[in-house]
């Protein structure tokens, strides 16, 4: 099967002015979101075509500054001493950095006494190596077995490129974590993750990673009915990995959409199996959270 990958040919400015909305979150939560739109990207549930890029950067940073000073967060939790803001929920910031004044954004968090920025990425942007955020930007490299990355994350950096970039980003002044997301359960999934863990260990050994600083976050797959139908309509490969109702259950998202996730009893067992395998091979990679 041949796939047609469309590249951005033009950016059209929308006449309607965008507005900054004051944001808030539930008690005890302190993450905020403003892609490479891969086959499993949740953003395509809401925006099937194209990509939205925020251009009112200074307005957004002003709101973040106000929130950081006047938020109800009483003390830091396990994530660190700063309030953490996700600066790239609706796109892959590293890939689309050319559409942003990224140095201003990174500089804002570098110099802010209370806040730090964070983003997950599937792309190695070498331009970032020339900027030292002094530990105030967290880069979370998304990882899955390479076999499935090629299918589900086309046109993104290979696992070798991502893993080779880890020590370079650390040396440049970034905090770096590994983002195992999404974890997809299928035949031989644990065998493939065992190989991935061996690959990570090999990179960490030969490239002299500061292993204590490289932590993990783990998110098992959640899929969406609208995205499922989109994938089928456009004949995107790999859908048989994502939509497996016999081992999944439905849930209604906060946006009102119909999602599916692994049935909760099965998922509890999957998490135990994955964690056991992870800790056997890369115990130094502390898991911050897994769900």
Predicted regions and their residues:
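Autoprocessing domains of the Hint superfamily
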Residues: 1-40
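Conserved Radical SAM active-site core
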Residues: 42-140
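Glycine-rich S-adenosyl-L-methionine
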Residues: 156-169
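A conserved active-site cap/scaffold subdomain adjacent to cofactor or substrate pockets
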Residues: 166-180, 187
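Auxiliary Fe-S-binding modules of radical SAM enzymes
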Residues: 201-291
């Amino acid at each position: 099967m041949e796939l047609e990958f469309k590249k951005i040919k033009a950016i059209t400015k929308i006449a309607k002015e965008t507005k900054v909305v004051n944001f808030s979150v539930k008690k005890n939560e302190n993450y905020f979101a403003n892609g490479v739109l891969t086959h499993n990207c949740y953003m395509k549930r809401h925006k099937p075509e194209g990509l939205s890029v925020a251009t009112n950067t200074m307005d957004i940073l002003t709101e973040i500054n106000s929130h950081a000073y006047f938020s109800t967060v009483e003390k830091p939790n396990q994530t660190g001493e700063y309030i953490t803001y996700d600066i790239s929920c609706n796109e892959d910031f590293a890939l689309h950095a050319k559409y942003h004044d990224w140095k201003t954004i990174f500089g804002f968090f570098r110099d802010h006494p209370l806040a730090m920025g964070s983003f997950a990425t599937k792309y190695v942007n070498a331009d970032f190596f020339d900027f030292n955020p002094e530990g105030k930007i967290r880069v979370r490299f998304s990882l899955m077995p390479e076999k499935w990355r090629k299918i589900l994350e086309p046109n993104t950096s290979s696992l070798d490129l991502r893993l080779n970039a880890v020590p370079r980003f650390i040396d440049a002044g970034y905090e770096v974590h590994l983002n195992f997301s999404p974890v997809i359960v299928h035949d031989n999934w644990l065998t493939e993750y065992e190989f991935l863990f061996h690959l990570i260990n090999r990179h960490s050994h030969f490239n002299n990673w500061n292993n204590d600083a490289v932590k993990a976050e783990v998110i098992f797959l959640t899929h969406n009915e609208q995205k499922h139908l989109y994938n089928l309509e456009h004949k995107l490969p790999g859908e048989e990995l994502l939509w497996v109702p016999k081992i999944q259950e439905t849930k209604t998202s906060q946006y009102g959409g119909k999602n599916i996730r692994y049935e909760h009893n099965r998922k509890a067992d999957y998490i135990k199996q994955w964690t056991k395998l992870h800790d056997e091979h890369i115990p130094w990679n502390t898991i911050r959270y897994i769900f």
